[in-house]
Regions:
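Charge-rich, low-complexity N-terminal segments
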Residues: 1-152
Length: 152
């Protein structure tokens, strides 16, 4: 069985060497969809009986590990030194330094890597993360899917 929980957050970024307007500082209303697989819990009387995982628990993990960390932050590539220096000069600015350019593809992959370790098989029902879908806009998104990600 597969279940999916959607969360939204706002963040700024730029794609430093992009040929178009994405090279400028800008922001998005991102949406993050987390898809998990597992067996439906059959334990009689368990709070999660009939579920793969309680949707509120799926949400809490994604909020703690990704959405709250990235929300109202500027996601900046470590190699984008001009912008990084500028952001570091602003006292108290919420900046998240990324090891890769913060494209939708790289953000989806980063979210997958972080969340994969967080959704552990706590119920004994073979729970695991299958996909992270990150919407940059309502019409543009990237998927990080378990069977397409190398174990690096």
């Amino acid at each position: 069985m597969f279940i999916t929980r959607r969360l939204e957050f706002d963040a700024g970024h730029r794609i430093p060497h992009h040929k178009s307007q994405c090279r400028h500082l800008h922001g998005h209303r991102y949406a993050l969809e987390v898809t998990l697989s597992g067996e439906v819990i059959q334990t009689e009387g368990a709070s999660e009986q009939g579920m793969v995982m309680d949707f509120s628990d799926v949400k809490d993990v994604a909020l703690q590990k990704i959405a709250n960390v990235w929300d109202h932050a500027f996601l900046v590539y470590r190699g984008d030194t001009q912008v990084l220096e500028f952001l570091n000069s602003i006292p108290g600015h919420k900046t998240v330094v990324m090891d890769s350019v913060p494209t939708a593809e790289n953000l989806a992959l980063e979210a997958f890597k972080v969340l994969d370790a967080a959704y552990i098989d706590v119920y004994g029902n073979h729970l695991r993360l299958e996909r992270v879908r990150l919407y940059e806009t309502p019409n543009n998104w990237a998927d990080a899917v378990r069977n397409q990600i190398s174990e690096s």
